[in-house]
């Protein structure tokens, strides 16, 4: 089982949204995915509840509460016993013993960020923290920045400057763009199943097209992440 962790010191950086998108891509590819809800607000648990109500939850995926150390340990053990292909961890903001344990146990670390000065500053702080933690523990875990909510059109001067600041870091080549399909995942449920349901309704063709573009985007990101894991 490969553990992929989404981490950021800043709340609202897009950790949960990025995780949901990647989860949909992996499940759509037939992978079994465990989700570790380590944020005390338990957004993944609420996501699952909403998805079940909308019949957009994939049974190949399961959410485990992991916002305390005993829960995390039990979640990891159970997920391995169940034979999941991947575990995706949604961490809480800031540093903590729990976050450190998740980071140190990971096969890949993803640091989501939007292209604002505050977000980039927090992403850089998170990256430095992760590197220092790995050095102190004598670990070498692949780490990459994932750009979030990138405008579909032209970037502003400020956004271009922020993007250039990331060039010295490992960055997932393809970003997640700012799309309604992504922002609505928490309410609608899993992206690939929402798309499947929309495809049967001829009156929803425009929304279906937007969902399809978003799905294609996370599939590309999923393949890029798989290459990082295989390296």
UniProtKB/Swiss-Prot annotation:
Keywords: Crown gall tumor, Plasmid. InterPro entries: DNA_Partitioning_ATPase, P-loop_NTPase, VirC1. It comes from the Bacteria. CDD domains: ParAB_family (cd02042). Coiled coil: none annotated. The Ti plasmid contains at least six transcriptional units, designated vir loci, which are essential for efficient crown-gall tumorigenesis. This is Protein virC1. The gene is virC1.
């Amino acid at each position: 089982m490969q553990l992929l962790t989404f981490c950021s010191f800043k709340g609202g950086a897009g950790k949960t949204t990025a995780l949901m998108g990647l989860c949909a891509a992996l499940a759509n590819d037939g992978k079994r995915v465990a989700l570790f809800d380590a944020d005390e607000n338990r957004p993944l648990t609420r996501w699952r509840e909403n998805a079940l109500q909308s019949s957009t939850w994939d049974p190949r995926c399961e959410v485990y509460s992991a916002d305390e150390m005993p829960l995390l340990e039990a979640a990891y053990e159970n997920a391995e016993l169940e034979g999941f292909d991947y575990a995706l961890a949604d961490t809480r903001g800031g540093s903590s013993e729990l976050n450190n344990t998740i980071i140190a146990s990971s096969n890949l670390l993803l640091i989501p960020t939007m292209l604002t000065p505050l977000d980039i500053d927090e992403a850089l702080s998170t990256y430095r923290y992760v590197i220092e933690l790995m050095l102190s523990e004598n670990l070498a875990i692949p780490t990459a920045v994932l750009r979030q909510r990138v405008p579909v059109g032209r970037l502003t001067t400020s956004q271009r400057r922020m993007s250039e600041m990331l060039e010295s870091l490992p960055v997932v080549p393809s970003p997640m763009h700012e799309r309604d399909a992504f922002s609505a995942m928490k309410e609608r449920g899993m992206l690939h199943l929402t798309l499947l349901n929309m495809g049967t309704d001829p009156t929803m063709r425009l929304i279906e097209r937007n969902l399809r573009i978003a799905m294609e985007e996370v599939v590309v990101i999923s393949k890029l992440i798989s290459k990082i894991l295989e390296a």
